[in-house]
């Protein structure tokens, strides 16, 4: 066995947790690598960012060396570059050392030929002859934007079923963000299609407090598991929001377990349900990867008392008016150059840190006002701030959290102007 060496501790790779659900013979690492948040570098010439391939290779090498074998990507991740980057990194390893998952992300074009081309491009980008886990990406919208329009009316589901039969897709499933009606409809097709897995957003906040049109994770999990379908978990940390939490909630978690990270609570919650096959984490930095390996080497399942403790924590978090942005960047690029996730992430950070001036009578007003405005300018260049939103709405259909993005940008911009004019 290869020893797993982590900063400040040492554990054996044999202790890591795997899941297996017959008749599927795959032995899948409970920690899966989400490839939506690969590290980036400033692009030559200063126009945006490019993926840091050298660092991606280092992260993938470390992950595989330490037992991670499930890698999840999509044609739309990192503005279209994730699949290629993931393929470059994985190609350097034996094919039997990893399972790769990708998706049909045909949000903007439901044409049959477009979907087939996207599928074949994924094989090419990933440099593989078959895809282990293939998903109908982000079901949940009604009508033409959902299952019916994107996969049934155009014959694409029939095409994918034939690809599964031919062995070029080993397991076929779908990921979900949306309405209960669309979820129930997709799941009801299991008897005729035989879904091999379903990917849902599951964390201790969304268990009973899903935002927007999304469905509570307790319902999603119970329904999928009742049909004996393995569950792949996405957003166990809500795009990092469950590690960037208000100070008193942070203290609440640390007091309960001083040795563990705040993130480890979320990963234990996501990994405890027995029908979970793997838990995806978009690990941009090595310390994220090492911390998550520590949590799942092996997983210590939550006790009933700990589970209730986290659900109570989620109740407390509902008092904080953050925008439910997970920094997925599906809304990007904005045609007017706005850094949409940058604006929303900064706003949420200030809410959680208490740097949200309420009025000039607040004793912390001056300090909080300065922290918000200076931090905003440092986080988001002026030409990319919310003030440039014209409300075109191009971003809205792409948001898996159903955020009314122009509305939130205009609200934040109005708040910023009030702070600048000191009219709160």
Model segments located where?
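Glycine-rich, proline-tolerant flexible connector loops at the mouths of alpha/beta enzymes
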Residues: 42-45, 50, 70-89, 140-145
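Glycine/proline-rich, positively charged
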Residues: 41-42, 109-232, 237, 245-250, ...
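Conserved, mostly hydrophobic/aromatic
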Residues: 21, 33, 63, 71, ...
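Single conserved hydrophobic/aromatic residue that forms the stacking wall/gate
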Residues: 1-13
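Short catalytic-loop micro-motif centered on adjacent basic/acidic residues
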Residues: 70-77, 170-175, 278-280, 399
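N-terminal amphipathic alpha-helix/helix-capping segment at the start of soluble metabolic enzymes
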Residues: 14-34
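Catalytic domains of carbohydrate-active enzymes, especially glycoside hydrolases
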Residues: 56-76
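Structured C-terminal cap/extension of enzyme domains
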Residues: 69, 194, 219-424
């Amino acid at each position: 066995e290869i020893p797993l060496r982590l900063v400040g501790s040492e554990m054996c790779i044999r202790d890591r947790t795997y899941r297996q659900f017959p008749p599927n013979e795959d032995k899948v690492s409970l920690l899966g690598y989400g490839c939506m948040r690969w590290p980036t570098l400033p692009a030559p010439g200063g126009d945006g960012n490019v993926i840091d391939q050298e660092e991606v290779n280092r992260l993938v090498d470390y992950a595989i060396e330490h037992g991670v074998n499930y890698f999840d990507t999509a044609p739309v991740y990192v503005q279209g570059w994730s699949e290629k980057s993931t393929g470059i990194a994985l190609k350097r390893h034996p094919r039997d050392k990893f399972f790769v998952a990708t998706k049909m992300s045909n949000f903007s074009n439901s044409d049959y030929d477009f979907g087939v081309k996207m599928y074949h491009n994924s094989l090419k980008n990933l440099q593989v002859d078959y895809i282990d886990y293939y998903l109908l990406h982000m079901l949940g919208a009604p009508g033409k934007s959902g299952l019916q329009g994107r996969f049934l009316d155009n014959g694409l589901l029939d095409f994918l079923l034939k690809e599964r039969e031919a062995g070029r897709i080993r397991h076929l499933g779908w990921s979900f963000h949306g309405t209960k009606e669309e979820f129930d409809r997709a799941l009801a097709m299991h008897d005729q299609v035989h879904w091999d897995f379903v990917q849902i957003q599951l964390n201790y906040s969304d268990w009973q407090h899903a935002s927007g049109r999304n469905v509570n994770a307790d319902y999603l999990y119970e329904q999928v598991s009742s049909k004996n379908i393995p569950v792949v978990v996405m957003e166990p940390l809500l795009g990092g929001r469950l590690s960037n939490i208000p100070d008193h909630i942070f203290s609440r978690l640390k007091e309960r377990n001083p040795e563990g990270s705040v993130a480890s609570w979320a990963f234990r919650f996501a990994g405890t349900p027995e029908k979970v096959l793997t838990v995806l984490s978009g690990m941009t930095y090595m310390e994220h990867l090492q911390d998550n390996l520590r949590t799942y080497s092996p997983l210590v399942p939550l006790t009933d008392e700990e589970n209730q403790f986290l659900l109570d924590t989620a109740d407390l978090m509902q008092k904080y008016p953050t925008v439910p942005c997970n920094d997925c960047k599906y809304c990007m690029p904005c045609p007017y150059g706005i850094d949409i996730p940058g604006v929303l992430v900064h706003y949420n950070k200030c809410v959680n840190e208490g740097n949200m001036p309420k009025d000039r009578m607040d004793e912390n007003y001056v300090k909080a006002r300065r922290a918000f405005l200076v931090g905003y300018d440092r986080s988001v260049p002026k030409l990319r701030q919310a003030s440039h939103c014209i409300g075109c709405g191009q971003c809205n259909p792409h948001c898996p959290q159903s955020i009314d993005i122009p509305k939130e940008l205009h609200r934040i911009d109005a708040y910023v102007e009030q702070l600048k004019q000191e009219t709160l």
